[in-house]
Amino acid sequence: IGQNMEEIEVFKDDEFSYASMIGHLRMLMKLNRLNEDSIDILRNLSLLPVSGVYKSAFKMWLELDSLKNVNELIRYGIISEDTENKTIALHPLIQEVAIAETIPTVSDCHVMLNHLHLICLAHGLDVKRPVTVMECLKSINRHIILDNRAYYLLFLQDMYPYFDKYLDTDYLSELVERIEYVMNLMNDSGKSDETSKSYNSDKSGTPDITQETNHISACDKALLLDYKAQLLFPRKEYDNAIKKYKKAIALMENYHKTNTADARSANLLSNLHNNLSTAYLFRKKLEEAV
């Protein structure tokens, strides 16, 4: 495949046929002739932005021993390389074919997701190129196939503080909508009896991906209310934020009446009380803020 895919023109009855172009790309790429490692590289890269990702970062996220297969795909013209900026990417049309052919699911892309998840969890550390990481997270959210909703919900929840930290406030509302969407999917699925699958990444020390059940916990519901309340601050809707914080606190207090508090639930309840106090301060209700 040539580097400049925009020069390919396919016509049927003198009219441009988008479907024909995709069909020709499928034949040219011949994914069935690639080895499994190369297919996995395409599967993961298809989730990342077409603007490009650093080649060294991609190697680290996939825990590749070498870039041999990546370089071969570059030589074939399937992957585009910007040698000046040291980035790699897929052309948008090739990305579309790669997604359709390799089916990038949460489970199959767990190694890369674990590394990005760990970056989101490192709240106290500044990472290199945070904008690149955020663009990767946005692209993944657009293209990932959700075969493991329980893990991906946790991943989305942990993305919020990362975007908030680097002040990408424009994306926060979309991220909250995505969180709620996944929660609704899990609710619609009912209580699943699917067999658990666990993927460990001993080399990276990143979290396990475990498929349990489509169960929405009190923590999930309270955290969604917390994030929704935070979105109200720029609009100065402090009273609505206070209502959401109170509802979230009630959820967690009821949860603790029948369940032993763990680190997650205890920390969340503490943060909710702090955030409620902050909302009262913005509302200039100093007595309630104490």
Residue ranges of predicted features:
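Structural motif corresponding to the intra-repeat A-B loop/turn of tetratricopeptide repeats
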Residues: Y166-T169, R235, R283
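Extended alpha-helical scaffolding segments used for macromolecular assembly and cargo binding
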Residues: D108-D188, E212-C219, L223-L224
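Hydrophobic/aromatic packing residues within the alpha-helices of TPR/SEL1-like helical repeat arrays
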Residues: V176-I179, Y245, M252
